[in-house]
Amino acid sequence: MRTEVLGDTGFKVSRLCIGTDYADVYGGSSLGRDILLEGFSLGVNFWDSSESYGSYPAIKEALKTLDRGDVVITSKTYSKHEDGAKRHLEEALRETGTDYLDVFMLHAVDTLEDFKNRRGVLGFLSEAKGQGLIRAVGVSTHSANLALALADVPEIEVVLAVLNMKGLRIHGGNVELMHSALKKLHDVGKGVYLMKVLARGRLGDRAEEALRYAFKIPYVHAVSVGIQNLSELETAVNVEKVADIA
């Protein structure tokens, strides 16, 4: 498994990131833990989570057998208010059993107005970073327009954005603009990784082709793929192995 440095954060991450947005897999069963640990044995050290995913139990169990510094863990908050974000961060730390998160993100920010409305939360996250509770601040977005604007926001160090070979689920722009935005983010030192490369299953019948498309983008550090079983993990790992960087 190839690795990349996640922009100016300096975090060394695997090109494949395990997306954990399946509460039935990562919430209560041992399967989620097994996926994370098997992925780690295959070189996957990057785990994407959120307060809304219900995946903290699997992360906590997996961390019991790993050194915390060997994995990069993200989480997110939908909250538009500081008290809600504080609660979500405290919950993430408590339920994963760790003292810090590598990246904590404003979740699903899809317009500039929404981003401006979350400035208070951004200020809180910057304070939390200063306290060592998080190591980097990020934003997840479906919007190409917002992704482009984030290149000029110094507080934002990591961007998780929607991109897939059919341009599905992109708001505020199109595939071409999203590519331009991600390249600019990459070039100014932001960490860049992708979500919804299979468009929440709509490209499932072309999964390997869709994964190759994502892994070949040279200005993307990692690709988050929702993994529901060990077979899907194996497929994603194998595609990453043979995907040539264009």
Task: Describe every region a protein language model picked out.
Residues 7-10, 41, 59-70, 90-99, ...:
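Acidic (Asp/Glu)-rich catalytic clusters
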Residues 24-29, 48-57, 78-85, 112-116, ...:
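Acidic-and-aromatic substrate-binding clefts and catalytic sites of carbohydrate-active enzymes
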Residues 86-105, 127-131:
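CE4/NodB-like, metal-dependent polysaccharide N-deacetylase domain
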Residues 6, 18, 47, 59, ...:
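Conserved, mostly hydrophobic/aromatic
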Residues 11-16, 43-46, 67-71, 98-102, ...:
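Short, well-ordered coil/turn segments that N-cap beta-strands
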Residues 1-70, 213:
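N-terminal binding-site loop/beta-alpha segment at the start of enzyme catalytic domains
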